[in-house]
Amino acid sequence: MPELTTAPGLLALVGLAAYLLGAIPFGLLIAKLFGLGNLREIGSGNIGATNVLRTGSKPAAAATLILDAGKGAFAVILARVLVGEDAAQIAGAAAFLGHCFPVYLKFNGGKGVATFFGTVIALSWPLGLAAGAIWLATAYTFRISSLSALMAALMTPIFAWGFGQRELVVLSLFLGFLIWIRHRENIIRLLSGTEPRIGAKKR
């Protein structure tokens, strides 16, 4: 973490605002807008872009991906411009937590992968690109979204350390740990060989 130079009260307000932004369930809203039905009753029941893709609508999945990543990036950039770097990291973490545990959905949200990428790339674009490269390489090789996310989450703090961005190591460890926790059912399916591949419709 960077040195905390901002007043704690202001950091708390930044965190609350970022959390409420991150908690917006864009996947659910887009699925309804596209007439795809209740996303909670489709595929895995998750509200993220991967599950939206299982409806067969690539435009809806792309829109969900962009908006879920965008809320993390927007929270970071706005906090950085208005307050400072310490607030930017708080905002990124809070937006991620909002997506995973949204107050609007009784704290039952998504797995945070897109918001993770949006947050990381806004905090450090080289780190975000490196994490994205790991996701793409794993997805290309194995065609499994969850495995790609897990590998990217695992490697991001290692990249942060290697790039000399020590102030991002703790945050990326925290976010990566939560991604692994949120993917615990996927990990079980990966170990049993039953995890669906990208584009597969899970019924």
Swiss-Prot record:
Its pathway?
Answer: Lipid metabolism; phospholipid metabolism
Q: What SMART domains has UniProt attached to this entry?
A: G3P_acyltransf
GO terms for biological process, alphabetical:
phospholipid biosynthetic process
Q: Which InterPro entries match?
A: G3P_acylTferase_PlsY (IPR003811)
Q: What is its EC number?
A: 2.3.1.275
Q: Which reaction equations make up its catalytic activity?
A: an acyl phosphate + sn-glycerol 3-phosphate = a 1-acyl-sn-glycero-3-phosphate + phosphate
Subcellular location per the Swiss-Prot or TrEMBL entry: Cell inner membrane
Q: Which HAMAP family did the record assign? A: PlsY
Name of the featured protein? Glycerol-3-phosphate acyltransferase
Organism, by scientific name, is Dinoroseobacter shibae (strain DSM 16493 / NCIMB 14021 / DFL 12)
